[in-house]
Amino acid sequence: MVENIEVSNLNVKVFGKWDTKVEVRDPSLKKYIDLMSIYLPHTGGRHEHRRFGKSRIPIVERLINNLMRPGRNKGKKMLAYNIVKTTFDIIAVKTGQNPIQVLVRAIENAAPREEVTRIMYGGIVYYVAVDVAPQRRVDLALRHLVTGASEASFNNPKPIEEALAEEIIAAANNDNKSVAIRKKEEIERIALSSR
């Protein structure tokens, strides 16, 4: 006989350690940063056929998927999983906070609000500043965080786990040492000049 167990009573944590009850301060990103409690962040691409399906993937898995960029880590999800797991341990030791909260803060700070698009009118190309969609803001923030970490650890004795932890912590503190913060400011500066 199977007992009815309430899902809310189950205490599922990411990697068996980290609670996903964190605060998203940016109201526009709240819907697109999924904080679902899941022990193993691997949905297996079940979102693919739904519109805006990737917004229902846990944010930790989206970070893992972004680590599998073409190049050295292409397709190696277990390697990316272990990188993020170790990174979260380093973040917890350095900051004393929940690493998922630090990651969410880093995404909020590194997400650009405005960018430039090309408009062709009468054979002349104009660059026009446009607002960035919330889904794209999260995508760009994750991409820039991962790119900054991989650039910092490439041809360098520093492991990628440490580089990613430093990148996330710097972005969470809105520090200019973070590549993601610098790229965001550059994108917004270009958009401001082409208004």
Swiss-Prot record:
Pfam families: Ribosomal_S7. Keywords: Ribonucleoprotein, Ribosomal protein, RNA-binding, rRNA-binding. One of its GO terms (molecular function) is rRNA binding. Disulfide bonds: none annotated. One of its GO terms (biological process) is translation. GO terms for cellular component: small ribosomal subunit. InterPro entries: Ribosomal_uS7, Ribosomal_uS7_arc, Ribosomal_uS7_CS, Ribosomal_uS7_dom, Ribosomal_uS7_dom_sf, Ribosomal_uS7_euk/arc. Gene3D superfamilies: Ribosomal protein S7 domain. Belongs to the universal ribosomal protein uS7 family. Part of the 30S ribosomal subunit. One of the primary rRNA binding proteins, it binds directly to 16S rRNA where it nucleates assembly of the head domain of the 30S subunit. Is located at the subunit interface close to the decoding center. This is Small ribosomal subunit protein uS7.
